[in-house]
Amino acid sequence: MKWKALFTAAILQAQLPITEAQSFGLLDPKLCYLLDGILFIYGVILTALFLRVKFSRSADAPAYQQGQNQLYNELNLGRREEYDVLDKRRGRDPEMGGKPQRRKNPQEGLYNELQKDKMAEAYSEIGMKGERRRGKGHDGLYQGLSTATKDTYDALHMQALPPR
């Protein structure tokens, strides 16, 4: 039975000419022109919408007033100081984890502030504040350390370097 079906298929194939199926695919020029037209119309519409949003935003800008309840406020660079203080909470020591300082004068900061009039000089230096601490006699080593850092420094003992 197999031989009979195979022989019939071979005869039919020999007698009938082999024709290729026509492909009405993406290579048809009419379809390419149609797709180009759709893409052109899409580009024109998208450009028109973009320009409308861009030019309508400048007219609507005064309508959005800045306030306390606004989620995003624009930067106000008009009142910016050249050397502005970062931490507005005076009396907080960053080396003590933000705890309040126990000083006689809480307005006296830990660090020296830059002075605007001295910045005009090319090689001006920042002077050191006089420290009023009860030390162990060699306070020259501890300049600029807070009490918490000074205690840690005291606990560590300096070891002599081995000779080379």
Swiss-Prot record:
Domain ITAM: 61-89, 100-128, 131-159
Transmembrane feature ranges: 31-51
Residue positions where Phosphoserine is found in the record: S58
UniProt-annotated location(s): Cell membrane
Any single Gene Ontology cellular-component annotation: Fc-gamma receptor III complex
Residue ranges, compositional bias (Basic and acidic residues): 83-96
Classification via InterPro entries: CD3_zeta/IgE_Fc_rcpt_gamma, Phos_immunorcpt_sig_ITAM, T-cell_CD3_zeta
Organs and tissues of expression: CD3Z is expressed in normal lymphoid tissue and in peripheral blood mononuclear cells (PBMCs).
Associated pathology: Immunodeficiency 25: An immunological deficiency characterized by T-cells impaired immune response to alloantigens, tetanus toxoid and mitogens.
Description of how the protein assembles with itself and partners: The TCR-CD3 complex is composed of a CD3D/CD3E and a CD3G/CD3E heterodimers that preferentially associate with TCRalpha and TCRbeta, respectively, to form TCRalpha/CD3E/CD3G and TCRbeta/CD3G/CD3E trimers. In turn, the hexamer interacts with CD3Z homodimer to form the TCR-CD3 complex. Alternatively, TCRalpha and TCRbeta can be replaced by TCRgamma and TCRdelta. Interacts with SLA. Interacts with TRAT1. Interacts with DOCK2. Interacts with SLA2. Interacts with SHB. Interacts with ZAP70. Interacts (tyrosine phosphorylated) with SHC1 (via SH2 domain). Interacts with PTPRC. (Microbial infection) Interacts with HIV-1 Nef; this interaction up-regulates the expression of the Fas ligand (FASLG) at the cell surface.
Record-stated family: Belongs to the CD3Z/FCER1G family.
Name of this chain's protein: T-cell surface glycoprotein CD3 zeta chain
The organism of origin for this protein: Homo sapiens (Human)
